[in-house]
Amino acid sequence: LAAANAAMETARKAPRLAIPSDMVGVIAAYENGLKGRLYAIVNDVVQSGALGGTRPPYVRELTQVRTLAPIPRPRMIMNTAVNFYSHIAENAPAEQRAKAIAERKANRGVPYMFLKAPSSVIGTGETIVIPYGRTELDWEIELATIIGRPARYVSAPRALDHVFGYTVMLDISDRGGRPPGGFTGVDWFVMKGQDTFGPMGPFIVPKEFYGDPMSRLKQTLLVGSDQRQQADASDMIHSVGEVIEYASSLVTLLPGDVIGAGTSGGVGMGTSVRGEQVWLVAGDEITATIDGIGTLRHKVAAAPAPPPGTGSYLPPLSTYRRGRGAAPAAAPAGSGGRGRGQ
């Protein structure tokens, strides 16, 4: 991008403008003069015929480059739990599930949000790793909103004014929970924060090219050739604007921050679609697509056992559960059990 800008400045005698060195810098400068320059660069490349014949070194086929995560280590990732009606009580009997959905429609409450580790982010084509001994790994496709302007106490109707664009995200989840003993609540760090649990990309589409997510969103996830999830925004409990409004009431949002909109029904822990729980296994391939943005593609592999002499680590699920996908084994009195997934 910097090379293309320098070439245009020389050939077109355009005013000099510094190009930021990373995506967060691009996002922060986008509405402060950079957007017009990027448009001009693209138009110049197209109109000069640089896409055909002999190309300058800064014009390449997408297949000739490796597509990294757009923001390899975001400052902050906030995800929204259970924000699609079809994801409510997915593993409950039909009557109980219908009741839970009706109750939520009658009282939506406020979004339920959690932080995801920035170190979990990987780009399309990178491998999702099942941690050693963890046999209940799940998939969730989400629309991720990228903040473009600082936001604090913004209203839902004005929230999209603070958005830079949108990308695809997978919220990979370890549903195995904590072993018995100690703290008894849901361990969100175990479930959501481990390495490779935050695939993101392949691109960020600026909001002016994507449109209103509440009318545009269509997302689909496949494991192999089997479609596991498909949804649009009509299934969402809180809109993208409402989620940003709530998030900005808790913390100051800055350019490059990522906000996941939540996932729909069809995740592995749910029984309402397939009648049984199904988990990711080594050799699986995930294809996650949001229309108008792009597709994430990831293979799944199992991590080896930790090396001898390793200190404390999360034990294999088989040491405190009766087997893959089985109900929790009985725990000693007063000990912790398995937390519910989100």
Stretches found by the model and what they are:
Residues 95-122, 139, 280-292:
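Structural signature of FAD isoalloxazine-binding scaffolds in flavoprotein oxidoreductases
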Residues 83, 116-177:
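Non-heme Fe(II) oxygenase catalytic core, chiefly the N-lobe of the double-stranded beta-helix
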